[in-house]
Amino acid sequence: LIKLTGLNHKEVIINSIAIEKIEEVPETVITLLNGNKYLVEESPDEVIDKIIAFKKRINDTKYL
């Protein structure tokens, strides 16, 4: 799960495994595998960084 900021400035928590694609048009649009779309303030690169950080965190054995 990653925490992002919706365009309404409220926190949105998204399951990163369910992300199908990320587009910038000019705001960032995240499309999930089920077709739901989320507009967020973070850039695509920031979203990717959050996904990588989350995956590193869940693969770190000290959290198990």
Question: Model regions: which residues?
Answer:
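Eukaryotic intrinsically disordered, low-complexity regulatory linkers and tails enriched in Ser/Thr/Pro
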Residues: L1-I13, I17-L64
